[in-house]
Amino acid sequence: NFMARMKLFYLGPEGTFTHQAAMTAADQFATLGDFDLIALPDVPAIMQAVQSRQGWGVIAWENNVEGYVVPNLDALIDAPNAAGFARISVDVAFNAFTVRGHSIYDCTGNPVSAHPHGLAQCTRFIAEHHLQPEPASSNAAACRDLKPGRVALGPSICGELYDLDTLAEHVQDFDGAHTEFLVIAPRDVVQELNARAHSNDAGDFETIITFIPLVTGPGVLADLLDVLRDAGLNMTSFISRPIKGHDGTYSFIATLDAAPWEPRFRTALEEIAGHGDWAKTLAVYPRRERPNP
């Protein structure tokens, strides 16, 4: 009962890594309908569009060099009616661009712009050329708004999209960097998609869940982790975030190798609720292949 045409919102402008993830998602879910990819200026706008049922969204979640994209993590925790149902990995490689016809033979000392994560992933190139980092809302925006005499860092697709000259290729500090994205939808839609995947026996799932202990005192976190261990739930990631406006209170975000409909998971959640802890599922998606460290 999905629409023939659906909107898929991503962080614009065209040419962001999120745009690449959105194109991958549109291919992956082509059986559900045709997608119109729509660029929005920021993640709050994406969350708003998804929760008001205008379509689905794609948000950056975690980078294997920089870690979690914290504002997006907070946005999903705070969203009353959005959850993730697919996880998509995009390889992150940066080129350095200049305005066509204004080639910089020596870019030393010039301003360089990219998304803050982009600047953080190209520190060697920036230092080598003594460039002055200036953060932009996205790598693609840095490329789109590039002025003569300046440098922008972004995915190779930006060169074609914005008609730029490539000053240097693969200027990132680490090869093999990738960013993981979540495809998000209203919570009831995610439940329906998961029920469909579950009934098709689509294999194993992962769940991202946030816990907020409502009681404080020694051992609260240890008790929570004991429940997960005793249920045989394998945890692949665990981080804490302060709860805004409530000093000393934290939410704990765990990624688990299990689906919420598995009996051991349900039992663990009931026990955690019995301790007086609040839990909210942020995403459930088919398990990724992970290389052994």
State what each model feature region is.
Residues N1-P293:
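Domain-level signature for soluble enzymes in the chorismate/prephenate branch of the shikimate pathway
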